[in-house]
Structures are given as C-alpha cells and as structure tokens.
C-alpha cells in the first residue's frame, strides 16, 4: 500500500479500465522490497507464489489486462490486474534493464504528477528513456489476454557437435518475448539469450 503514495495518489489511474497502472505497481513493490531486504532468490520465489493468484482462476486467461467493457468496477480487481500485472512489470524491467526501467517510471510520475495516467502514458515514458519501441509489448501484454504455455525438446548432432533447443508454444495465440536458455557443459551453465518469435515452434 505504501507504493500507492506514488502510483495511485501522486498519479492515479484515469479510469477503472486502467486500474492495473495503480495496482500492478503495488503488487510489484513487494518484489522490490523483498529483493532489497532478502535478495533476488527470495524475491523471485515470492513473485512465483504471487503468480499463483493469476493461475488459480482459469477464467483469468481470457481477460485482458486493460478491459474497457466490464459490468462493475469490482470486476477489475483480481489476479489479472494485480498478480499478472506485477509479473508483466517484472518482464518489462528485465527487457529494458534497471536503469531505463526506473528512469522511465520517474519520468512517468513527474510528467503526470497530481493528475491521471494510463498505460499509454507509461509506455511513452519508458520509450522516451529507453529509445525502444514498446508497442509490441503493450499490445501483447496490456491489450491482450492469456499467457504462453511452453514446452521444449532438444536434439544433438554428434557430427557437428551441435545442440538444437526447440521451444514450443501450446496456446492458440502466439507470443513473442526474449528468453534465457541455460545449457550445461561439463557441469557449468552457459546462458544463451534468444528471441522467441510469435509462432508455434522456435529452434535455437
């Protein structure tokens, strides 16, 4: 609730449709505090547990993060607005990097202080600071619904000494996103950062 001094009071959502602009930050602030106080591993664990609030209700998969048609404002509260929203902020932070992410939040707050804000303005602030086009991210995560359902297979060519990792998306609407793959060689992990395109199978 302390985070609402900034995301909710200093800048408040311009409509119930954009409620996640307030509540996802309150949710994600718990991660930031746990990371600061107890370290990244514990914070990652708490984020994983928080995501269960989204996955617990099967109907959440069909709900957009920003919803412009709803019966009651109470419909906007729940696992999508809070838990999924917080996880999406974490993805955005990892994609942009800490410097750009937090500088973008500062710009958003200063630009809209004592007024209202919406996801569109958050995107513009983050784009301004990072220099990256985030339309694809917001269209997919803020204006869309669902989540990737991933599985993977591996194959090894002994002649070429080449490992292929195939990432399979099991849902009907495909996502694009960066992904880190750890490959172990002689007991030591080698991290490969790849880009998963919006299609059923990606080979790396």
Residue ranges with predicted function:
Residues 134-135, 148-204:
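Beta-strand-rich binding/interaction modules
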